[in-house]
Regions:
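NAD(P)-dependent Rossmann-like dehydrogenase/reductase catalytic/cofactor-binding core
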Residues: 209-299
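Rossmann-like NAD(P)(H) cofactor-binding subdomain of soluble oxidoreductases
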Residues: 31, 46-131
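Internal alpha-helical scaffold of NAD(P)-dependent oxidoreductase catalytic cores
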Residues: 86, 104-111, 131-178, 190-230
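Short, well-ordered alpha-helices that flank and scaffold nucleotide-derived cofactor binding pockets
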Residues: 17-21, 81-85, 107, 266, ...
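NAD(P)+-binding Rossmann beta1-loop-alpha1 motif at the extreme N-terminus of oxidoreductases
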Residues: 1-53
Length: 299
């Protein structure tokens, strides 16, 4: 199967590298990382020790059987435009943080669009090198819920490459649960410059729990059954499992890059039908940092 990974950052490179054990892979990205992969291959270290040699380019090819989108949420519109120029994209799977990505892709593409989540931990440690901080699974399915042959095909592609993959019929609930996890962990660790496990202890635990509970309330308002303590338990479970990891938003802040806070905490603020002061404050603080410090480069 020909798989295009659109967004050769840390997660996209890790997923592409793992899929490359079985499938033909094209990584689409930019900058020094793509040049290094093109010249010397992609090296995975940490929990996975592997070198693969995918095609690396700055624009998508004409066709693919599966496209995995891993760009930052703010780059989804540009990704959708680029993928729309393909003759055939096959099945499109969003493995992105935040909410609203699938809708943006579906509006621009004729291909079936799937939603996905993953708990793989990835960190780019140098051009052409990505460290796997934790082996996880991929869960995917139609973003509106239910079953689809496209989801079955995509799930099979991951399993063929030795990746634990589940095809799920309850993606709306899973996406909101992931949003609660990200809303609690990402901005708190980014602002405090701490590893994920720090949100399990005060003074940060109360803030992270508050963000997760507010996200559950917004989910309920959207018609998704997610209880506040379920959201907290999910957030704390991920924080415990990834206690020594650096969150993606903290990586962005420390690198001076824009973050995905608008698609995470900002999304909760937009969708909530009651006050969400914790998410509003976190979104404002990270947004204020971006306005003053984040550089223009979004790669």
């Amino acid at each position: 199967m020909h798989v295009v990974v659109f967004g050769a950052g840390s997660l996209g490179s890790l997923v592409g590298g793992l899929l490359g054990r079985t499938h033909e892979i094209t990584l689409v990205g930019r900058g020094e990382h793509v040049r290094a992969v093109r010249a010397d291959g992609l090296r995975l270290t940490g929990a996975v020790d592997l070198t693969v040699y995918p095609e690396a380019r700055t624009e998508p090819p004409a066709s693919a059987n599966l496209v995995v989108v891993t760009v930052k949420a703010f780059d989804t519109p540009a990704a959708a435009d680029a993928l729309a120029a393909m003759d055939e994209a096959g099945v499109v799977l969003s493995l992105q943080n935040g909410m609203g990505n699938e809708e943006t892709l579906a509006a621009a593409l004729p291909s079936p669009v799937l939603a996905g989540t993953t708990d793989f931990g990835a960190e780019r440690t140098g051009p052409g090198v990505v460290r796997c901080n934790g082996v996880g699974e991929v869960v995917l399915g139609p973003p509106e819920g239910g079953e689809s042959p496209a989801a079955d095909r995509a799930g099979g592609a991951f399993r063929e490459a030795g990746i634990d993959a589940t095809v799920a019929a309850d993606m709306p609930r899973r996406l909101w649960t992931k949003l609660a996890v990200n809303a609690g962990i990402n901005p708190v660790t980014a602002l405090a410059r701490v590893d994920n496990g720090a949100v399990l202890e005060e003074p940060l635990a109360g803030i992270a729990r508050g963000a997760a509970r507010e996200t559950a309330a917004a989910a309920t308002a959207a018609g998704v059954d997610l209880g506040p303590e379920e959201a907290v338990a999910a957030m704390e479970g991920v924080a415990r499992e990834t206690a020594d990891n650096v969150s993606s938003m903290r990586q962005d802040v420390e690198a001076g890059r824009p973050t995905e806070v608008d698609a995470i905490n900002g999304y909760v603020v937009e969708r909530a039908e009651e006050p969400v002061p914790v998410n509003r404050t976190l979104a404002a603080l990270v947004g204020g940092w971006e306005a003053g410090e984040a550089g223009p480069g979004r790669d």
